[in-house]
Swiss-Prot record:
Membrane-crossing residue ranges in chain numbering: 12-32
Name this polypeptide is given: Probable glucuronosyltransferase Os10g0205300
Cytoplasmic side: 1-11
Subcellular location: Golgi apparatus membrane
One GO molecular-function entry: xylosyltransferase activity
Stretches the record annotates as Disordered: 138-169
Length: 351
């Protein structure tokens, strides 16, 4: 039996559609949530990129114009430590010992190591690993007395040339040429130095000196040589060598230091009688120090006792090296390498 046909759909009229739309719109205007439920649908907006921040005024500071401002800390003076050296058995030991002391000294410090003759690779390798700012220089070797030309009718009684004086002069030439401003100090490698010495060196304004203790070989007594001070004023000298009483200043080579500007600025010297400040390589033994100091100062009034009162021994001059020791160049030898006593081969028992 066939199903009855569906009635045709009637099209929705426009007035009915508008009525449903208005009812839905009006219903959306009334809140249907619980009255105790509050929803914060208003989220805070981020501040704009061009927002202006208002800061509070800083507290007012009263400045006294009459009160002087604190002075900036004075920069440390450069220490120019000059050390002459030469190839010998204890050279590496002396240089390493001095390098350990200089490494503990406050910076800035420049170590001028001057070799007698051409600069060697062994010394250069040692200086590269010492941890101290340095400059490796070389000085020409002085001629031996038998190599000097002889003249008829004249006695050959010229004093021996001090190679260390030429080495120190090479360092002074380097300092003057490059205008290295600081305190110049001659530190021989075989001496023993206290760390306090390098702190007091920067207190020197023009020329400073202090006593040095010397331990002579084969003697149990210590010889003291240097100034006698009242405060920072030098009033006398310690000396026990009567054969050197003719010296003007009884100072050891490692017992004084001076401002490097004395080398090129005559106004900073005690007198202007010398135009070229260098050590005399032909001076007699024991008179090298006083001959050089006489070029820097005129008398004791131009000296400063370091430290005040000269009450500290800050370095020792030792004589511990054997002059007859044999030094092998590069610490290598090709002689006496044969076996003198061979080992006996003993029969080992079988296990």
């Amino acid at each position: 039996m066939a199903a009855p046909p569906c009635p045709p759909r009637r099209p929705i009229s426009a007035p009915c559609f508008l009525l449903c739309f208005l009812l839905g719109f009006v219903a959306g205007l009334f809140p249907f949530a619980h009255r105790h439920l509050h929803l914060d649908l208003h989220l805070p907006l981020p501040p704009p990129a061009t927002a202006i921040l208002v800061r509070e005024d800083p507290p007012s500071v009263v400045v006294d114009v009459d009160t002087p401002l604190p002075a900036a800390a004075e920069e440390r003076k450069l220490l120019l430590v000059v050390t002459p050296t030469r190839a010998r058995p204890l050279q590496a030991y002396y240089l390493r010992r001095l390098a350990h002391t200089l490494r503990l000294a406050p910076s800035p410090l420049l170590w001028l190591v001057v070799e007698s003759g051409a600069a060697t690779r062994d010394t250069a390798a040692l200086l590269r690993g010492c941890g101290v700012m340095y400059r490796h220089l070389s000085s020409p070797v002085p001629d031996a007395p038998q190599d000097r030309p002889r003249r008829r009718g004249r006695r050959q009684d010229r004093p021996a040339v001090d190679s260390r004086a030429r080495q120190r002069n090479t360092a002074l030439d380097h300092i003057e040429h490059h205008r290295l401003h600081g305190i110049v100090y001659f530190a021989d490698e075989d001496n023993v130095y206290s760390l306090d010495l390098f702190y007091h060196l920067r207190d020197i304004r023009s020329f400073g000196t202090w006593p040095v203790a010397t331990l002579a070989p084969g003697k149990s007594k210590t010889i003291l040589q240097g100034p006698v001070c009242e405060g920072s004023r030098v009033v006398g000298w310690h000396t026990t060598d009567r054969s050197k009483n003719q010296r003007r200043f009884h100072v050891d080579m490692s017992g004084f230091a001076f401002n490097s500007s004395k080398l090129w600025d005559a106004k900073n010297r005690g007198h202007q009688a010398w135009n070229y400040i260098r050590q005399l390589d032909t001076a007699k033994e024991g008179f090298q120090e006083t001959a050089f100091i006489e070029q820097l100062v005129e008398d004791e009034t131009h000296m400063e006792g370091v430290p005040p009162g000269c009450s500290k021994i800050m370095n020792f001059h030792l004589h511990l090296e054997d002059k007859n020791a044999i030094y092998l160049n590069g610490w290598q030898t090709t002689q006496n390498l044969d076996v003198i006593i061979p080992l006996k081969k003993e029969a080992r028992p079988l296990l």
